[in-house]
Amino acid sequence: MSKSILKKEIFKIIAKSLSIPEKMINENVSSNNYEEWDSMSHLNILIALDKKLSGKAQKIQELSEAYSVKKIIQILEKKKLLK
């Protein structure tokens, strides 16, 4: 577990949560363009991020409403949790 995360680790978490190949993940992926990104997948993303960030993600309210890779990255950058 870590106190910060790399973009490629975010991509890997999202790919696994959406059950799609990691090579398909980029900053434009969102719930608007991937039907796989439903509420259950979003919850799985949040749980995996929280585990990777040693419990820090659960304290970031904005993540619960971040339904895109770009938004997740922006929030983690703002909170200084992105390497």
Q: Could you tell me what each predicted segment is?
A:
Residues 2-47, 51-83:
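Phosphopantetheine-dependent thiolation modules in NRPS/PKS and related acyl-activating systems
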